[in-house]
UniProtKB/Swiss-Prot annotation:
Involved in peptide bond synthesis. Stimulates efficient translation and peptide-bond synthesis on native or reconstituted 70S ribosomes in vitro. Probably functions indirectly by altering the affinity of the ribosome for aminoacyl-tRNA, thus increasing their reactivity as acceptors for peptidyl transferase. It comes from the Bacteria. The keyword Nucleotide-binding does not apply. It is found in: Cytoplasm. Disulfide bonds: none annotated. SMART domains: EFP, Elong-fact-P_C. One of its GO terms (molecular function) is translation elongation factor activity. The gene is efp. SUPFAM superfamilies: Nucleic acid-binding proteins (SSF50249), Translation proteins SH3-like domain (SSF50104). This is Elongation factor P. Coiled coil: none annotated. GO terms for biological process: peptide biosynthetic process. The keyword Repressor does not apply.
Length: 188
């Protein structure tokens, strides 16, 4: 499917020079005083991992990869792979851990994720927007801290470090965004 250079967004997977590239940074739209407007895009090659900056005219059209999306349940780790089960057909799928990169600690047993396939090959895994995790380490609660809006460091059960409000204690469950690893609220 062809998309305008102005429509490119972070996370889009493009077919460029016969390779698959994921847009890794928010594209910069620039309109210089002289010449035509262009879009500066930082991309990462999904096969080799190399990064590249692409500059496209606002009038250019690029090929967006047509991905098939399946709901899968995470079962367990097997070596350097994740073993997932297609929730519709119950087929087991092995996916390399590298696909998740920094988001790997958010993966919990039986979590439902979306796996995006290109030509029947798993390309990306989309985690739920938020997860509920327990605080395993943080400073003690300070009395009267509900009034202030300051944050303190905390380590969650999966080892991720986040900033949490002063009134939270060890053992409490919180909601965390998976895209930028930030605190949202206390879990209900």
């Amino acid at each position: 499917m062809k998309i305008s250079a102005n429509s490119i967004r972070t996370g889009n997977i493009l077919v460029y020079n016969n390779d698959l590239w994921v847009v890794s940074k928010t594209p910069e739209h620039t309109q210089p005083g002289k010449g035509g407007a262009y879009v500066q895009v930082e991309m990462k090659n999904l096969k080799t991992g190399t990064k590249r900056n692409g500059r496209f005219s606002s009038s250019d059209y690029l090929e967006k990869a047509e991905l098939e999306q399946k709901d899968c349940q995470f079962l367990y780790f097997e070596g350097n792979n994740l073993v997932l089960m297609d929730t519709k057909h119950f087929d087991q799928i092995n996916v390399p851990k590298e696909i998740l990169e920094a988001k790997l600690p958010f993966l919990t047993e039986n979590m439902i994720v979306k796996v995006e396939f290109y030509n029947d090959k798993p390309l990306t895994i989309v985690l739920p927007p938020t997860v509920i995790l327990a605080i395993s380490e943080t400073d003690p609660v300070i009395k009267g801290a509900t009034v202030t809006s300051s944050y303190k460091p905390a380590i969650l059960e999966n080892g991720i470090k986040v900033k949490v409000p002063q009134y939270l204690a060890i053992g409490e469950k919180i909601v965390v965004k998976t895209d930028d690893m930030t605190y949202v609220e206390r879990a209900k």
